[in-house]
Amino acid sequence: MAKLEAQQKDDLQEKLIAVNRVSKVVKGGRIFSFTALTVVGDGNGKVGYGYGKAREVPAAIQKAMEKARRNMVTVELNAGTLHHPVKGRHTGSRVYMQPASQGTGIIAGGAMRAVLEVAGVHNVLSKAYGSTNPINIVRATVDALVHMKSPSQIAAKRGLNVDEIRG
């Protein structure tokens, strides 16, 4: 019960993406365990994902949530959308995301939608190519978000101010 209260104090949104039963074959038969994939975010640019494995489903989910909280990254957003189109990839999965106008919503499938929701993105157009394995899609999505640069970051890198870059 104490863990539950701590989760509410953090004010983080948590989403369970996938639970999977896996087996290990041993001499005496099969040993079943469960894996869980979760994402956690504050709805304001911080997002993390976690993958947990245990003999019982609740324990796997709890492990995944803890790992997600430990692996959070910060993403700079532009009023609920992205600054520019971005691509991300992880193994066989590739994702493409582009900013969308107000009122568009999150046009994304499954695992990518969950990541974008908890990150605080409200308007985005996206597409997943290649493998749609949830773990790879989540990692590719986070990769794309991390590599997105804000105009202020680009201006600082070039030694200019934001108005000069925007033209």
From Swiss-Prot:
Keywords: Ribonucleoprotein, Ribosomal protein, RNA-binding, rRNA-binding. One of its GO terms (biological process) is translation. It holds the Pfam family Ribosomal_S5_C. SUPFAM superfamilies: dsRNA-binding domain-like, Ribosomal protein S5 domain 2-like. PROSITE patterns: RIBOSOMAL_S5, S5_DSRBD. The N-terminal domain interacts with the head of the 30S subunit; the C-terminal domain interacts with the body and contacts protein S4. The interaction surface between S4 and S5 is involved in control of translational fidelity. Part of the 30S ribosomal subunit. Contacts proteins S4 and S8. This is Small ribosomal subunit protein uS5. It comes from Shewanella oneidensis (strain ATCC 700550 / JCM 31522 / CIP 106686 / LMG 19005 / NCIMB 14063 / MR-1). The gene is rpsE.
